[in-house]
Regions:
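Generic structural signal for secondary-structure transition and capping sites
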Residues: 23, 35, 63, 96-99
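N-terminal helix-turn-helix DNA-binding core of bacterial DNA-binding proteins
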Residues: 5-50, 77
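Amphipathic alpha-helical dimerization/coiled-coil segments
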Residues: 28, 85-110
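Basic, amphipathic "hinge/linker" alpha-helix immediately C-terminal to the N-terminal HTH DNA-binding motif
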Residues: 70-94
Length: 110
């Protein structure tokens, strides 16, 4: 997506970055701090292949930073970039809205 959306509606840009059901959950997990691949895989309950694909995409788009340590066995950690961290207030708003919506569903038995 990099550069192909230059000059397009910001909502379209955000939608394309966050498409799929895992992007927000990955951002939420990394917003809590640096994580290893297996930690993300376990915490989010996502398949290895899907997580790998999503992290590569998010790294390419500048939201996630991947750090490889020269150790044996290799250690790789993922964290949010400065741009990824700028999404934190949006995550907070989504969480508040989600909590309110859950209460709405309970009250209205939907």
């Amino acid at each position: 997506m990099t550069n192909e959306l230059f000059g397009v509606c910001p909502f379209v840009t955000a939608q394309k970055l966050l498409q799929g059901k895992w992007a927000i959950l990955i951002l939420h997990a990394l917003n809590e701090g640096t994580k290893r691949f297996n930690d993300l895989e376990r915490d989010i309950q996502i398949t290895h292949a899907t997580l790998s694909s999503q992290l590569k995409y998010m790294e390419k788009e500048g939201l996630v930073h991947r750090t490889v340590y020269p150790e044996v066995p290799p250690r790789v950690e993922y964290s949010l970039t400065a741009m990824g961290r700028r999404f934190a207030p949006v995550l907070d708003s989504i969480q508040v809205w989600g909590e309110e919506y859950i209460e709405f569903l309970k009250e209205n038995r939907i």
